[in-house]
Amino acid sequence: MAQREIPFLFMRGGTSRGPYFNAADLPSDRDAIAKILLQVVGAGHPLNIDGIGGGNAVTNKVAMLSRSADDAADIDYFFAQVSVLEQLVDFKPTCGNILSGVGPAAIEMGLMPAIDPLTEVRIKLVNTGALVVARVQTPGGVVHYDGDTAIDGVPGTAARIDLQFMDVVGAATGKLLPTGNLRDQFDDIEVTCMDVAMPTVCARADAFELSGYESVEELEANKDFMTKMETVRLAAGKAMGMGDVRKSVTPKFAVFAPAKAGGTIAARYFMPWQAHPTMAVTGAQCLASCAITPGSVADGLLTRPSANPATVTIEHPSGTIDVVVDYDVTNNGLDLRSAGLVRTARKLASGQLFVSS
């Protein structure tokens, strides 16, 4: 069978990596898109040997970009998470790390012009409907990748990209607390189910007899914990109104512990069948929001910041991530106006990908 070529950019976005496409170069039908992305990544093999995936959830991510018809946005960003081992593409979640590369990629693709010295890109997250403003370094009207900003989980430094997330509450379920409760209990594990940028089931590490400081390898080798966590996640997914989530990567899962390296709180985040080597951008917003919500499972593990906006520093397996949260505590929980983070991105390659026609 003949192969056909599809133009693409290959980029690191935050602590993730994957192909970025102009949506005009792909079919409009999601089933047809999924068939192409399975080939692109090489899904179905632990090393994704017949594609450009990296054998890990953080390297099997795809961004599809187009000019937005929404007056509030410049670019529509449609995300897909492609499974490593299964023939499965999930269009439900979004990815904040891959989002870090959307502004630069949109400019590189000619979807919007660059402005000297800084280009503000208003991005609509198609999967969730949220709006993000990305500020991209573009001196001389050209995307600048070199810089002095370091993020934990990525070697070296790169140009700073500021992300300001708006309208992130209830991104998937329409509610801050999808179950209607600050705390729920599933299979004897107490959790807080929260939907801020990414629906996430949060628990205390000690509820699973964990310290909360385990490495990725230690967590994934603990089969009893991974099985128990999935049991709790499935029950929580139903209670959150998300239905049967056995084949969905949402809701995500996280466990909290007291900070031990000068941060606000320590956490381990799951995608959900693998432990995240660092921390997801969308997940970090949800965890930061949960951490500062009185009465959540994180209550008692930290001293809540008194400033507003508040900087919440989350310790993860590779270091820390800072989330700046603009909020008010109300009788109903949290009134979250926006959340901001600093990320970096880098163009790794550009060219043509080949798939069966």
Task: Describe each region flagged by the PLM.
Residues 1-357:
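A glycine-rich beta-to-alpha transition motif near the start of alpha/beta enzyme domains, typified by
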